[in-house]
Curated annotation (Swiss-Prot):
Intracranially injection into mice does not elicit symptoms. The keyword Nucleotide-binding does not apply. Keywords: Disulfide bond, Hydroxylation, Neurotoxin, Secreted, Toxin. This is Conotoxin mr3c.
Protein backbone atom coordinates (compact mmCIF):
# COMPACT_ATOMS: atom_id res chain seq x y z
CA UNK A 1 0.00 0.00 0.00
CA UNK A 2 0.99 3.65 -0.30
CA UNK A 3 1.96 6.06 2.45
CA UNK A 4 -0.37 9.06 3.12
CA UNK A 5 2.03 11.40 1.29
CA UNK A 6 1.98 9.17 -1.80
CA UNK A 7 -1.81 8.78 -1.58
CA UNK A 8 -2.19 12.51 -2.11
CA UNK A 9 -0.30 12.11 -5.38
CA UNK A 10 -2.76 9.47 -6.58
CA UNK A 11 -1.02 6.29 -5.39
CA UNK A 12 -3.39 3.41 -4.66
CA UNK A 13 -4.23 1.51 -2.60
CA UNK A 14 -3.56 3.69 0.43
CA UNK A 15 -2.39 2.40 3.82
CA UNK A 16 -4.54 2.94 6.92
Amino acid sequence: CCAPSACRLGCRPCCR
